[in-house]
Amino acid sequence: VRKTEGLFELAGIPAELVKAFSKRSRELDASASADDRDQQQRRSRQAKGEPTDILRRQAWKDEVTALGYDADIIVQSAVGRRVAEHPLPDWTMVAEEITAKDSCPRVRDARRKITEHLVGFNIDKSSLVEIQRQVISERFIDLGFDTSREAICTTQAVLRAERRIVDIAPKIAARSAHALHPSQLEQALFYADCDHEQVLAFRAATSGRDLTVIEGAAGTGKSRTIGMVVEAYKAAGYQTLVTAPSWVATKGLGEAVGSDYSVLPELLNDLRGNKRWLPPTSVVIVDEAGMVGARSMASLLTEVESFGAKVILIGDRHQLQPVEAGPALSLALERLPHESYATLSTVRRQRSASDREQTLRWRAADPDAAFEAINFARAQGTWRSVKSEEQAADSAVDLWASFQAADEEVLILARTHAELRAITDRIRKKLRDSGQIVGEDAIILAADRQGNLFDLPIARGDQVRIGKRVRKKGLINGSGGTIQEISTTQDGVVEIKLLVDGRIVSVTSEELRDPESGGLKIRHGYASTTHAAQGVTVKNTIVVAGTVPTGGAPI
């Protein structure tokens, strides 16, 4: 029976055993660990105090016997057993899962997901085909074909969210309850260090509509402009609140402009659960709005309208796609008056004029501009083409090592988690060889953003990133640190001491545990996917861009 992504429960195992073992698993691990603590240590790939496989298996076998079952044949006897306690999946929830990341999935992908949810139900092929047909016809809406002539579909929930954005955005924009007085604007601009383009964006955000969009490429001064907006509104007695899809972007902008902040998923949960409210004098600033999906944007705009607050969307439709389904920023702009929109087109962050022009080439989404960008990068020596993915990872790590040797800040970006693992393995080997990572690896069961479980080797000296907020420890999703010590308590709890921003923070496996998958929300911090790094500014970036269509050479 499918449980979570990549995990299945064996159909036919008695329910009392499933319940008992879910409750007792940690106790059994701790018991086995205590029995063996003084006699054995893991010789490799485990932390001191973790139970050996032999002792763990024996402890579980004893528990099965105590419950009146034969541990040697329980799995075999479960095969083919009729399991009535597992109903068919909730197909509405399955449809929501299918459209969580893609608002218009291909029909064949929807069929594949439906099949995954039926694993363990002993359904013959003809029945499976009929169930697929019924679910798709009842839960999905036919959208015809995409540009590749593949059949695509969507759901009513997706259409409702997208329609809600299109309907509500102009209503909020029609209000002007938060317009600052001209004298307040002039006072704010008198002390501001900005150019004409930023002045226009500042005026659009403060002098008129209750919904404003400021769009611009990376490095065009969006954060600087918003800093002026926050300062002006706070001086006029308004409350500002910064939010974004990720904690890194939320905290980065919130602290940079001196505003209260809350990550978007948490903010929406608090607003829906009446744990938080927005005074009518609130100005909500959404950073990285281009990465916000339709459902989240529809919920946020609904809350903003009901509280009578103002919202400013900052982002770029030409950068990364939303992390969830639906082009929310594009939808919001469809029916907004031109007074609600400002654009920043001058790149200010890069040092040279040629680098600033290069930023706009990469953003253009135009083949001619892309070839110009590639040719310029080749001439500057910042473009490398190799023959294989292995060579791409080797080249990226060698370049990373050269920046490290020069004590320069550097970040590696890759497209996929598989590429990240290949890069991380190479970096960890270099750090072990140089003595920066020491001691044996401890293997912990970690979980990625989708809840997929994987073994994560960590040791003293490793750089890691936390994947969830641990409020009482001052850690957010994305906090990075260096491991100082790893230990395991007598009850089996793993404790990790980290050096984070100059302070020692101790965090436990229970604090990092994902309640859905059971894995720990922690990963290595040597490289990042492009989505996870959105909103981060660093001096040097190494991008493993993948395989290009012409010739297939990884970059």
Regions found by a protein language model. Give the residues of each.
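Helicase C-terminal subdomain and adjacent C-terminal extension
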Residues: V1, S25, R43, R56, ...
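Beta->alpha loop/short-helix hinge microenvironment recognizer with preference
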Residues: V1-D210, E215-T220, R224, V230-A235, ...
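Conserved, well-folded catalytic cores of nucleic-acid-processing
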Residues: L7, A11, R24, K113-G120, ...
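Hydrophobic, well-ordered secondary-structure elements that form the walls
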Residues: A110, I165, A204-A205, D287, ...
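ASCE P-loop NTPase helicase motor core
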Residues: A110, T212-A373
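Conserved helicase motor core of P-loop NTPases
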Residues: R164, L200-A204, R209, K222, ...
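C-terminal accessory regions
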Residues: G308, I423, R465-K473, N477-I555
